[in-house]
Amino acid sequence: MHRFFRILGLAITDFPTFWQRLRARFSSPRALPANADTAASSAAVYQQWIIAHDRPGYSARVALDLGPLAIPARQLTTRSVTDRRPSDGDTHIILLSNHTVLHDMAVFEFAALIQRCPSIALVYGDYDHVTGMGERINPVFLPDWDPDLFWSTGYLRGAILVRADLWDQRCGMAEDTTFESLIFGLVTAVGDTPEQIAHIPHILSHLPDREWIEPRPRLDAHFQAVRTYLQTSLPGADARQIEPHGIVDVRRPSAPAPAAIAVIIPTRDGLEVLMPCVQAVRQSVSMHPLEIIIIDNASENQATLDYLAELKADDPRVTIIRDDAPFNFAGLNNRAAAATTAPLLCFLNNDTEVISADWLDRLAAEALRPEIGAVGARLLYPDGRVQHTGVILGLGGVAGHGDAGRPADDPGPLYRAVASHRPSALTAACLMMRSSIFNRLNGFDATNLAIDFNDVDLCLRLHAAGYATLLLPAVELVHKESISRGDNRDPAESARFAKEVAYMRDTWGADLDHDPAYNPNLSIALGEAYSLAESLRTEPVWKRASRS
């Protein structure tokens, strides 16, 4: 450990003191000696180790098999996990989920991050699983902090670093405290300052493989923590578990006063897809006043023109805008958005069809959250396979759909195909946002991104303005993708597409190469989303230091 400090040009005194809290069920202590080895390797730097356990009267030294050369007795203290004493002046605590083994360099990685960012309140890392034979399998590469994914899945596992003053706020646990409720309490204590939660994109701990095989017990425990919190802290909210996986769907309370929603549908002929799209919207039941704006881009088919005329005559909620300019998806949406005063805009492709009856209310409840800039839905191909559950930056060069083609009942890595989470970008095939934000950002970029990537660009500008983008899979639509538009195969379209790709790379290159919602250990090659990257885009501090 001293060698790495020297390589980094740091003195040992530059690093904080850590307090390691090992939460262990001693009925199965086979993994604990490895943690003793980790502690022993750091004993010269970190002078006090506190082993917190849940078996009164049991010897932590015996359970950990700490020999005389491991940690000196004066450096080891045992406590009950329900101990209500504060952190006694120490700066940080490492919490481990049951039967977790620390990576040899985990403490160093935590210390290096805290040295750079001392105000960080909570830090987590990636993890893998260990079989009974000691084989490491099934690595889990996490995104940077995603509060909505955490509420849905409680994805923080393994080794969690907590600043001592945050621990003191939550000091003391009930006798039946679970790791899930403890972490949930610490996360909610951070509250409205999510920037104080950091992620180290490297494997820092090893969990027993039964957590991979049987995840339901921890998901049930997380659900109980969420439900308890909502009952006391967020009146009007509701949570349920989505079967068969057990992830949590949080339904937030409705706005006190309904906000009008303008659903904007660009179209050019394509009557066979436009009719079911509009019919589903018209039949939607919502507490919000509804306006439907169809912007017709030079339709020529008489049946389409007759249908639009009938719509306008039959339904006072429908507005038809004619635009005969060359196809410009961004410009069409901007023109329609400028024609309404509705507080909420829902951009909707004409080749989509709503499945979820309460889709407008669900999207609106999320779009009205102060921190949310835009909300998207889960989109399915007509054959039932997944088309969109969020966009991955950099995939295939600019951005792509990582879950495209996945079976509808496949939850995907970290349940992100079925759980609410914050991808870095969303498709505008179904996208709801506040008109005030849309107007402040000057809408879609109709000059540089007339057709492709204008939705990704808008999402990146939302992030730059301090807003998050949210995928709400509880809302589902069928998407018959680009039926009325066609493809990019002719030379002019190919040239236009290449120009838009170049604009995105020139404007957002650094962001496209570092998607915070997608772990840098994972591939960005087209068709290889969520597989291990052949060329890693990140490296642990200790590896960089060892080459110096």
What positions do the PLM features span?
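Glycine-rich, basic loop-to-helix element that forms the pyrophosphate-binding segment
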Residues: 80-88, 323-340
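Conserved donor NDP-sugar-binding/catalytic core segment of glycosyltransferases
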Residues: 104-137, 192-195, 352-398
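A short, conserved alpha-helix in the catalytic core of glycosyltransferases
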Residues: 166, 175-196, 200, 226, ...
